[in-house]
Amino acid sequence: MSRVGNKAIEVPNAVKVDIKDRNFISVEGPKGKLEYQFNHRLIITNENKVITVKRPNDEIFMKKIHGTTRALLSNMVEGVSKGFQKTLKIVGLAYRAQIKGKQLILSLGFSHPVSVAIPDNLEVVVNQNTEIVIKGIDKQLVGEFAAKNVKLRKPEPYKGKGIRYVGQYVRQKAGKSAKKTRKD
């Protein structure tokens, strides 16, 4: 059984945490501000720059959301203090990326360029037309936007063409072997 929910969250000095109505949490730091409303049955306290999450009983539902709530709070604190980043790499001949305004334009071998709207809370940078860096304070939003772009053209197993996370291993398959002809 996981004990994630029992760990306390240390809050850096630059981060300010406000708890309203026992379940509405506002976390503000140098990178920005995040707000979230958690389950009202959990007891969340902030004492001496340490956040603790307690559950009132050992019901199965309470056990499930206890660890999840603690992880979400930890991600909020880390996001407003350090931020989150995901880097994508585009592999393939003539596969390119560029930014026009609040749109990410991808050329991925389709008959048309693919346009993806960049959310307001994210910063997207394209390096050398083949590397996309996604930065933001909300871990979920950064991950969703990265996954959405990878899904547009997943790496294929023969040549590895597509969009992948930097450091992701793409397993390569052997291509068809030539048919042997017999000479008599």
Curated annotation (Swiss-Prot):
Query: Superkingdom of this entry's organism?
Result: Bacteria
> Does Glycoprotein count among this protein's keywords?
no
- Keywords noted in UniProt: Ribonucleoprotein, Ribosomal protein, RNA-binding, rRNA-binding
Can you supply one Gene Ontology CC term for this chain's record? cytosolic large ribosomal subunit
- InterPro entries in alphabetical order: Ribosomal_uL6-like, Ribosomal_uL6-like_a/b-dom_sf, Ribosomal_uL6_a/b-dom, Ribosomal_uL6_bac-type, Ribosomal_uL6_CS
Any one Pfam family match given in the protein's UniProt record, by short name: Ribosomal_L6
Does this entry carry the keyword Transcription? no
Q: Which GO molecular function terms does the record list?
A: rRNA binding; structural constituent of ribosome
Gene Ontology BP, a term:
cytoplasmic translation
| Entry's family note | Belongs to the universal ribosomal protein uL6 family.
How is the quaternary structure described? Part of the 50S ribosomal subunit.
User: What name does UniProt use for this protein?
Assistant: Large ribosomal subunit protein uL6
Q: Which organism is it from?
A: Aster yellows witches'-broom phytoplasma (strain AYWB)
Q: Which gene encodes it?
A: rplF
